[in-house]
UniProtKB/Swiss-Prot annotation:
Cofactor requirements of the protein: Zn(2+)
GO molecular function, one term: 3'-tRNA processing endoribonuclease activity
Residue positions of the active site: 67
Residues that coordinate or bind Zn(2+) 2: 67-68, 211, 269
Name of protein: Ribonuclease BN
HAMAP family: RNase_Z_BN (MF_01818)
UniProt-annotated binding residues for Zn(2+) 1: 63, 65, 140, 211
The keyword Hydrolase belongs to this UniProt entry's keyword annotation: yes
CDD domains given in the database record: RNaseZ_ZiPD-like_MBL-fold
SUPFAM superfamilies noted in UniProt: Metallo-hydrolase/oxidoreductase (SSF56281)
Protein's UniProt keywords contain Hydrolase: yes
A Pfam match: Lactamase_B_2
The protein's assembly and partners: Homodimer.
Length: 304
């Protein structure tokens, strides 16, 4: 999987950062992309990335503050203007359906494709056999969620050398054996593919947080993930101000990553008060607690 950050600023865009939007490319022979939040200007950011509105098949909104949703109506209309006919699924908190319906109706807009809007609560939202998405409630002045995305475990590798030693030559039967099936050879012997497979490879796990102050749910959401994306709106010394507005500091995000056993922390949602140089100080605050902390930048793409 790949994550591309289209916007990493909190509240207001700056000259170097747009407001929140993250694209997930699930890959695994999939052509569609998933979008997490859609702040104002997200379409413009897409012009500088590999994503286009027509490639988006699912949108997950964390909460209804403007810096996370004001880009949504334009993106929906652009899909229609481009002649897109593929369905689009939107997931978000209560009110997202009214927001979408109202903005389209009052602007005289419509969609040329099936649009399905799901108002969510805590729990698993989907399981398509390859990926699951689960929503966790967070602490913010409005209803807000974080999303945990998990790949299914992948089959182990087939030990071709052992099979050859057993007299099984490469051929069409190998595909069945890779699936762990039992096959019958021409000489009447049966071979169980599961006996020649290595242990399953664990699927990747990602946690994408919406805006949040400290909450016990955070560690559960991020438990053992490969990548944790968490807001670091303000520096550690401004915890009272950050928490009072439903936000987190560098120190608090790093503590969640450490306590959850995450492998990487991607810091995002920076107050526009911080310059690029000052963000390095924020990074140092996180790394002092959780060394595998990284600054997200607009257009940064990481492989999970």
């Amino acid at each position: 999987m790949e994550l591309t950050f289209l916007g990493t600023s909190a509240g207001l865009p700056s000259t170097t950062r747009n407001v929140t939007a993250i694209v997930l490319n699930p890959q695994n022979n999939r052509s569609g992309l998933w979008l997490f939040d859609c702040g104002e200007g997200t379409q413009h950011q897409m012009l500088r990335a590999t994503a286009t509105p027509g490639k988006i098949e699912k949108i997950f909104i964390t909460h209804l503050h403007g810096d996370h949703i004001f880009g949504l109506p334009g993106l929906l209309c652009s899909r229609s203007m481009a002649g897109c006919e593929t369905p689009l699924e939107i997931y978000g908190p209560k009110g997202i359906a009214e927001f979408v319906e109202t903005t389209l109706r009052l602007s005289g807009s419509w969609t040329s494709y099936p649009l399905n809007v799901h108002e969510i609560t805590e729990g698993q939202l989907l399981d398509d056999g390859e990926l699951t998405v689960t929503a966790y409630p967070l602490t913010h002045p409005v209803e807000c969620y974080g999303y945990r995305i998990e790949e299914q475990d992948k089959p182990g590798a087939l030990d071709a050398a052992r099979l050859k030693a057993a007299g099984v030559m490469p051929g069409p039967l190998f595909q069945q054996l890779k699936r762990g099936e039992t096959v019958t050879l021409a000489d009447g012997r049966t071979v169980c593919g599961a006996d020649y497979l290595s242990a399953p490879r664990p699927g990747k796990k990602i946690a994408i947080f919406g805006d949040t102050g400290p909450t016990p749910q955070a560690v559960t959401l991020a438990r053992d993930v490969d990548v944790m994306v968490h807001e670091t709106t303000l520096e550690a010394a401004m915890a009272e101000k950050a928490n009072g507005r439903g936000h987190s500091t560098t120190q608090q995000a790093a503590e969640v990553a450490r306590d959850a056993g995450a492998k990487r922390l991607l810091m995002t949602h920076f107050s526009s008060r911080y310059s690029a140089e000052e963000c390095q100080r924020l990074l140092a605050e996180c790394q002092a607690i959780f060394p595998a902390s990284e600054l997200a930048e607009d257009f940064l793409t990481i492989t999970v």
